[in-house]
């Protein structure tokens, strides 16, 4: 199974390793391709969009032609996993905890509202246990994490967390062929990557 990892920024290698390990666990041979230009999306069965800095990812994707190409692939049914900044990049509505509306380039494929830097900057990074109803309890690493605050359409918010200022927020979301996490599953677990592989296999 050919799986792409958007390689504009972020922990590309960790996602590649997580997909390979997840593939072994479900009995699928995974070939990971670094996606740096639209042609790299050819024949991929799933795609990961790693963390990094969401504004930079958006600008680079726009400049390389990947913004439209990735959007088309996801809207065409390719299962996609967006983590941290990658999740922000997938959201239709993005605000910053400090500056408000950002106007940054996004894919806008998921019916979710996201608050960037909801838990503060790098020094407020933390670990927590989250519950994803279909995957159970997961150890989650949050690094300058966003929070998911609203969903509409067929999108569903998962992994509830209590936030000091925002109240009840969520650390994950799912909609059709898309999964978004505010945390970095590639650092602690293969469960989320297995979920995406199973989506590609038609098991979810």
Curated annotation (Swiss-Prot):
Its EC number is 4.3.3.6, 3.5.1.2. The keyword Lyase applies. It holds the Pfam family SNO. InterPro entries: Class_I_gatase-like, PdxT/SNO, PdxT/SNO_CS. NCBIfam families: PLP_synth_Pdx2. PANTHER family: PYRIDOXAL 5'-PHOSPHATE SYNTHASE SUBUNIT SNO, PYRIDOXAL 5'-PHOSPHATE SYNTHASE SUBUNIT SNO1-RELATED. This is Pyridoxal 5'-phosphate synthase subunit PdxT. The gene is pdxT.
């Amino acid at each position: 199974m050919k799986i792409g990892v958007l390689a504009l920024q972020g922990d590309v290698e960790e996602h590649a390793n997580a997909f390979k390990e997840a593939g072994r666990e479900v009995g699928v041979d995974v070939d990971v391709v670094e996606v740096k230009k639209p042609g790299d999306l050819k024949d991929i069965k799933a795609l990961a969009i790693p963390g990094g800095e969401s504004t930079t990812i958006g600008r680079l994707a726009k400049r390389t032609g990947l913004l439209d190409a990735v959007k088309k692939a996801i809207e065409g049914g390719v299962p996609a996993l967006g983590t941290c900044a990658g999740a922000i990049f997938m959201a239709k509505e993005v605000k910053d905890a400090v500056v408000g509306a950002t106007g940054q380039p996004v894919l806008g494929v998921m019916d979710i509202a996201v608050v960037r830097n909801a838990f503060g900057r790098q020094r407020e990074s933390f670990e927590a246990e989250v519950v994803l109803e279909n995957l159970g309890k997961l150890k989650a690493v949050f690094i300058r994490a966003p929070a998911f605050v609203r969903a509409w359409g067929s999108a569903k918010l998962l992994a509830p967390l209590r936030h000091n200022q925002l109240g009840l927020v969520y650390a994950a979301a799912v909609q059709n062929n898309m999964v978004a996490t505010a945390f970095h599953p590639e650092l602690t677990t293969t469960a989320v990557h297995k979920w995406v592989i199973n989506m590609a296999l038609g098991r979810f």
